[in-house]
């Protein structure tokens, strides 16, 4: 799931 708030990915 990509975290579009930070640009990183939530694992």
Curated annotation (Swiss-Prot):
Expressed by the skin dorsal glands. Keywords: Amidation, Amphibian defense peptide, Hypotensive agent, Pyrrolidone carboxylic acid, Secreted, Sulfation. GO terms for biological process: defense response; regulation of blood pressure. The modification Pyrrolidone carboxylic acid is found at residue 1. The modification Phenylalanine amide is found at residue 11. Coiled coil: none annotated. Its main location: secreted. GO terms for cellular component: extracellular region. The modification Sulfotyrosine is found at residue 4. It is found in: Secreted. Isoform 3.2Y4 differs from isoform 3.2 in not being sulfated. Hypotensive neuropeptide. Belongs to the gastrin/cholecystokinin family. This is Caerulein-3.2/3.2Y4. The lineage of its organism: Eukaryota, Metazoa, Chordata, Craniata, Vertebrata.
């Amino acid at each position: 799931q990509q975290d579009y708030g930070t640009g990183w990915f939530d694992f």
